[in-house]
Amino acid sequence: MALSQCLEDSPGWRTPRKEQDSNLNELYNERHRLALEELVAGGVQSFMGFLKKERMPNFLSEDEIRRVSRAAVVPKTISINGDDSHLDQSGTLDCSSVTYFPEVSDIEPPVLENGWPAFTTGSYRGVTRAVAYFQPSYGECIYSCKEAARRMIRNAKEVIAIVTDSMTDLDIFHDLREACTRRRVPVYILLDQSSVASFLQMCKNLCVHLDELLQMKVRTITGSTYYMRSGARITGKVHERFMLIDGNKVATGSYRFNWTDGKLNSSNLIELSGQITEKFDEEFRILYAQSLPLPVNTRAPSSARNCSLYDHLVLKAPGTPPSYLARTTKPQAERLTSTPARLQTPEIQRMNKDIEEPDRKSNPVSDSSTLGEDLELPLASADPPRLPSTTVNSQTQTVDVTIVSCCDVSTQTTCHTADVSVQTCKEPQNSKPSSEHQEVDSCPPICPLPQDVNFRECFLKITKERQHHYSSIRSKLDHMVTLLSHKRELVDLTNLPLRPGLNRGRKAQQEARQPNTNIDSGIMGTWPKSRGLQ
């Protein structure tokens, strides 16, 4: 970790400060706090009634009243309709307003793991300079604020740190992606909590997964939190907007990183450089230490982690129900097929008749595959993958009935079935009913689950991936064969027999280059001629 990441190195950290000669009534107003409690607990009418009773002017605008009402978080045990009047409001209730955040916390702050400029405390960063940009501009560039921000991002070499309440501009985000992927510049973004949903929606529209951008770290921050005696709290928003570049340049102002500020709204941007950037450096590290990671349920998913192609292969019980059980147990409607249109097929009706008449002979048509014929429909394709089939005799030696938990292959539903060591063949044979039917019928009822996997699509995806893998290997092998054949042709050309006239001319040339031969032989050594031609 760079030395500049430690807040203890900041100037004035943990040093006694002089008492300010400011009026405490201007910093804290008890009547305002009580009025806010009435607003959160009783609504706007209760708030106005309290102001009228205390003869206070309304210190909140209508827009602020709506924002405070929406931002207020009331504990679940406290009613927002004023049913908590029985609680003691004299201050004896243990509430959050009397707590404090310790100066030294036991929670480890997040680390700037991708790196940070190694500026030591009080190091000289240059003369403070400022350049102002206004938009719309009447000079050479109309959108001067946006162009200035993009130019600073393109010229960044060490780090890009952004604090903003809006990040939905596609051009700005494209420049940030290019900086962290191509130039390997660390990018840190602190977003206001209310704008996270818009940012994630933009990433989803661009098919961008934040987990794949290793050099970009996005976290959320909030404003100050106002606690009340009832346990309710009001959390403010972040209105800070600045971008720190390489630790010695800062862009700040009213400009926001969205399309409306880039094209429609009037805004300003101030580019600062020099020693003044040390204050922004410290402020960003403080905000980063207070930030939180993106919510797990709203984070942009990673394609590798959330791929459902192989989900049906995970945590599956060994073994599948044999074909004998399909004829001896009553089939469930949800387990018959993966398509609802096949609920009443002739095969299924025939199976139901066999169950109703236990004294009848077994069905002469036997399933030769343990997967069942329900799997044939979703696997019908141009080149379907071949599944292993089992063909065995129907002679029964021993019967071992064990209740196990298995998985239905055709519908991917888990149930409890009885594994019976019975082998059947395709030839029609008569068999007498035995105690096996009674033992199988005593198994627990089958609990069907909804189907969520399409086998045909899964196998097609696997086939495409294999073809792509094999084609890449084949192209590499062809390239290697081409290189080897080319080298062999060069070796054959050097070993061709020459006519006597050409042979004498070649000897004369070799004698003329006799001084260079010693040098070449010293360099080449004992290498073969084919290696020398390379």
UniProtKB/Swiss-Prot annotation:
Gene3D superfamilies: Endonuclease Chain A
Keyword tags: Cell cycle, Cell division, Cytoplasm, Cytoskeleton, Mitosis
Positions of region (Disordered): 320-372, 501-534
Intracellular or extracellular location(s): Cytoplasm; Cytoplasm, Cytoskeleton, Spindle; Cytoplasm, Cytoskeleton, Spindle pole
One cellular component term from this protein's GO annotations in UniProt: cytoplasm
One example of a Gene Ontology biological process annotation: regulation of ERK1 and ERK2 cascade
Polar residues bias (residue ranges): 329-342, 511-520
Compositionally biased residues, Basic and acidic residues: 350-362
Pfam families hit by this protein: SACK1
MF GO annotations: protein kinase binding
Function: May regulate cell proliferation, growth, migration and epithelial to mesenchymal transition. May also be important for proper chromosome congression and alignment during mitosis.
Protein family according to the UniProt entry: Belongs to the FAM83 family.
Protein name: Protein FAM83D
